């Protein structure tokens, strides 16, 4: 790309109530459940779990070796409530939804190839599958993540906060009045006392930013388009919320200097252009499946993706652990100012601890050549799965709650160990 070239780039995000993202949360909550049991009995759990939801049905499929009885149907229904679905909102009903479980233990042949259930043998723990994984970092933000990704995450957090505040107040009002929560929405004198009363849990957003390419490094200039679509109550009209949502989005863009007079806001554009609202969302509107939002989960289209999803997989699966480690490597290279932007690739074959290759590309922004940076990587980082798990403490349920990665993204969040600083030997 030519020096100082300007271009437009788009990324998208979805809320916790989006059906695909809800499935990620269910799969990762089961993983957390198993790892907590593992902590107590000191035996390795192996989890590869897919969740599918549609209508009022939750399906779980996969292989789980856990030292504790598999969660009950009531446990899953509580999780559905936590995600934000409710009968009143025409979503998955946590009081009546059926839960179908088709899960068995990890296949013996895979277990034999990968490990011998010896957690101490970190040198011999093989990769859980073949594949390629990527880590990416950029100096656009203090979090060393793309600016677009960061803005979209802030949108999600702001929407979730408004949704949870409104839901709490509606429940309190319903209890005080002795009525159903749905009746609060239907009663103007009650609902009008609650800010964002009409907001439901399913939502999608998209932002287009004008970037300047500065000799391989990326400089965000301004947001050109901000798109937000939210599920809402059937009792609200577009006119009633068309000011509130743009204010919320603009507030985030203003905070990071990304709003300009040229920024176009497209808010629930379907209702504005066609007259049809978005009152039916979640799994009633669309089926959801674990692992279908892999770009949302990573860098929003920047960098690259090897194709393997994260959620529902224990750390022996390099789809997850090696992608976290590649991010750990990338963000530490940028943090150490060895480059301004970098992509790291690693690949494996099942059963073999050592990676087949490690690749680094600094897009011409490095203070060293890419081959010299590769030497620095090999000197400071060990990509064998057992060492990854140990260094990042990936089996410690007190350190990591994997369901939290499914909430609002896996990267750029300082509470996760793969985002921590490592002092490098040059």
UniProtKB/Swiss-Prot annotation:
It holds the Pfam family S-AdoMet_synt_M. Binds 2 magnesium ions per subunit. The magnesium ions interact primarily with the substrate. Binds 1 potassium ion per subunit. The potassium ion interacts primarily with the substrate. Pathway: Amino-acid biosynthesis; S-adenosyl-L-methionine biosynthesis; S-adenosyl-L-methionine from L-methionine: step 1/1. Its EC number is 2.5.1.6. Induction: Repressed in strain X by infection with X-bacteria. Removal of bacteria does not restore expression. One of its GO terms (molecular function) is ATP binding. Belongs to the AdoMet synthase family. This is S-adenosylmethionine synthase. It comes from Amoeba proteus. The lineage of its organism: Eukaryota, Amoebozoa, Tubulinea, Elardia, Euamoebida.
């Amino acid at each position: 790309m030519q020096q100082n070239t300007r271009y437009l780039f788009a990324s998208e995000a979805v809320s916790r109530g989006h059906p695909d993202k809800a499935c990620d949360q269910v799969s990762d909550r089961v993983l957390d459940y198993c790892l907590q049991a593992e902590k107590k009995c000191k035996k390795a759990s192996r989890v590869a779990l897919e969740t599918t939801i549609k209508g009022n049905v939750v399906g779980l499929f996969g292989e789980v070796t856990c030292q504790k009885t598999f969660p009950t149907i009531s446990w899953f229904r509580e999780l559905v409530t936590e995600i934000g679905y409710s009968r009143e909102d025409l979503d998955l009903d946590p009081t009546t939804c059926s839960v179908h479980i088709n899960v068995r233990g990890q296949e013996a042949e895979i277990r034999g190839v990968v490990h011998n259930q010896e957690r101490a043998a970190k040198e011999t723990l093989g990769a859980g599958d073949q594949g390629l994984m990527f880590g990416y970092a950029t100096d656009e933000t203090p979090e060393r993540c793309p600016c677009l990704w960061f803005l979209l995450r802030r949108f999600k957090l702001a929407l979730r906060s408004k949704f949870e505040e409104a839901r709490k107040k509606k429940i309190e009002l319903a209890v005080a009045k002795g009525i159903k929560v749905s009746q609060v929405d239907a009663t103007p004198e009650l609902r009008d006392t609650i800010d964002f009363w009409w907001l439901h849990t399913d939502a999608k957003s998209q932002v287009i930013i004008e970037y300047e390419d500065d000799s391989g490094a990326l400089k965000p200039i301004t947001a050109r388009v901000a798109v937000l679509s939210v599920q809402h109550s059937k009792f609200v009209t577009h006119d009633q919320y068309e000011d509130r949502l743009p204010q919320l989005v603009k507030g985030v863009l203003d905070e990071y200097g990304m709003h300009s007079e040229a920024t176009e806001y497209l808010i629930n554009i379907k209702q504005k252009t066609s007259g049809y609202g978005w009152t039916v969302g979640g799994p009633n509107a669309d089926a959801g499946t674990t692992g279908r939002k892999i770009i949302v989960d990573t860098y929003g289209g920047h960098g690259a993706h090897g194709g393997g999803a994260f959620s529902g997989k224990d750390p022996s699966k390099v789809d997850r652990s090696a992608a976290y480690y590649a991010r750990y490597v990338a963000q530490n290279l940028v943090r150490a100012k060895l480059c301004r932007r970098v992509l790291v690739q690693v690949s494996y074959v099942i059963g073999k601890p050592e990676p087949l290759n490690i690749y680094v590309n600094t897009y011409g922004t490095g203070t060293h050549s890419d081959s010299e940076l590769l030497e620095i990587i090999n000197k400071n980082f060990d990509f064998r799965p057992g060492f990854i798990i140990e260094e990042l403490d990936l089996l410690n349920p007190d350190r990591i709650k994997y369901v939290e990665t499914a909430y609002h993204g896996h990267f750029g969040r300082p509470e996760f160990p793969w985002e921590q600083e490592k002092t490098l030997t040059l």
